[in-house]
Design a protein with these regions (language model features):
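Dinucleotide-binding Rossmann-like beta1-alpha1 core, especially the glycine-rich loop
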Residues: 55-71, 75, 85, 90-115
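Short coil-to-beta-strand
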Residues: 74-81, 85, 415-420
Length: 461
């Protein structure tokens, strides 16, 4: 047996940020040589859906100083961006307080550079397999082109599942003016400057669509609607200090009451409400795992939509684009449900049932869907995950948020060699969508994989 064949082989399915971060920490922290294979069809690792964005209007949603890989020095990405990124060519990135909100692709390049450095600096090897994982058989990942990758450890770092096409629009699924995937390159470019646009969904993706239209010089009307009509809030200027408070005791209702009471207390100290929410976020995984199953379901049913629009905020530049369109009368939002959709020639006729009561009819030239990932159907969204599920290796979590895992992020199933990294594990950990949490989780998964490999080696030695 060759030295390479005797080295443990870790297969990572998914090469976006989560997968690249796991690979990086495996390389950095392993005390023995490893073979790492990352199965990812995109041409480069570390970008994924979020950081593959090429539209200059799409910016990172938090200041660069808060974007980093776990284990990096504070502000590492901010310093890299100012020295090596596109900072000189992007004057709009910097705000009056000195903070910078780079275009999203910059962070993907930062991750890619760190990964390349780790490959050179450490003893492990990394192979990027530009395919999709398609099947699973007898401990092997089978790619779409038939490669068989025997895995001593498998890490699922899968991307967000695609949105589910709402039933009310399925009969126009092939209509050229229905934009079901606004992330597709050039998807919005064909919209004329004076076209009337409706956007189904009012959260982060909607904000990106409006920012793109604004950058293109769109002058037509834009209507964004969702059942509750809640828009993502903007980030505040960097605060001089953080809000210090613990939210790790009490029932869900008691914690909510404390958070609400702390917002005016923080304001009295000159801190915005965002500082309080950031304190909650930093304790989010602990809080989530302390809640009862009934409280988790209560949160998902009644509070999640409010948490999401306050927790997952938009860059000030994006907020400004929305504000400008609202000020000139070309943007409005509505709390409404799409009851019916008809087509007359090239015009969509929307029948909207308002949350406040009554019905509104709206004619638009384009309908854009930004309803978000369909996490409840994650396992069914990819053939590889379906194969793992059918083999008893993984199963959906009980809350419909992703894949069921244990406290070590191991998939609950027939094997002890499968881990889940990133948002697909949030049914267990809760707060696992923001980059700082995903980065730290990736490091923890890498450490657990390495510890497991070491334990097996000691047993067989």
């Amino acid at each position: 047996m060759s030295r390479t064949e005797s080295e443990p082989h870790i297969v990572i399915v998914g090469g976006g940020f989560s997968g690249a971060a796991v690979a990086l920490h495996l390389l950095r922290e392993s005390r023995r040589a490893l073979r790492i294979s990352v199965v990812e069809p995109r041409p480069a690792l570390g970008f994924g859906v979020a950081y593959s964005a090429t539209d200059p209007a799409h910016r990172i949603n938090v200041p660069a100083a808060r974007m980093q890989l776990a284990g990096d020095d504070d502000g590492a990405f901010d310093r890299w961006y100012r020295r090596h990124g596109d900072f000189p060519q992007d004057p709009q990135a910097q705000l009056a307080d000195g903070s910078v909100y780079p275009q999203r692709g910059a962070f993907g390049r930062y991750v890619q550079e760190n990964l390349a450095q780790a490959i050179k600096a450490y003893s492990g090897s990394l192979t990027h397999i530009r395919e999709r994982a398609a099947g699973w058989h007898d401990g092997c990942v089978i790619t779409a082109e038939g490669q068989r990758l025997r895995a001593d450890g498998l890490v699922l770092a899968v991307s967000h599942p695609p949105p589910r096409l709402p039933k009310v629009v399925q009969h126009v699924a092939q209509h050229p003016r229905l934009i079901a995937n606004p992330w597709r390159a050039g998807a919005l470019a064909a919209i004329p400057l004076n076209a009337r646009v409706a956007i189904m969904g009012t959260a982060l993706s909607m904000a990106d669509v409006v920012a793109s239209l604004h950058r293109q010089g769109h002058q037509g009307t834009t209507l964004a609607f969702s059942r509750h009509g809640l828009l993502s809030r903007a980030n505040a200027p960097l605060a001089a200090s953080a809000w210090q408070a613990s939210y790790q005791t009490g029932t869900l209702r008691q914690r909510l009451r404390q958070i609400r009471a702390d917002i005016p207390r923080a304001a009295a100290q000159g801190l915005p409400w965002q500082a309080v929410l950031d304190a909650v976020r930093s304790q989010g995984q602990t809080i989530w795992q302390q809640l009862t199953e009934a409280e988790k379901r209560q949160f998902l049913r009644h509070l999640r939509r409010f948490w999401d629009v306050h927790r997952y905020r938009i860059a000030p530049q994006v907020a400004q684009a929305i504000a400008e369109k609202r000020a000139d009368g070309t943007f409005r939002s509505l709390a409404a449900r799409l009851q019916a959709l008809t087509v007359e020639g090239e015009v969509f006729c929307l029948q909207l049932a308002q949350r406040s009561g009554g019905t509104v009819w709206q004619e638009v030239d384009y309908l854009v869907l930004t309803t978000g990932p369909d996490h409840a159907d994650l396992v069914a969204s990819q053939p590889f995950l379906t194969a793992l599920h059918q083999d008893g290796q993984i199963r959906p979590d009980a809350l419909g948020m992703g894949i069921e895992v244990n406290a070590h992020s191991q998939a609950v199933g027939a094997s002890s060699r499968i881990w889940v990294a990133g948002p697909a594990a949030r049914g267990r950990f809760g707060e696992l969508m923001g980059l700082p949490q995903v980065a730290e989780h990736a490091r923890q998964v890498a450490q657990t994989v390495l510890q497991t490999l070491t334990s097996r080696q000691n047993v067989t030695a």
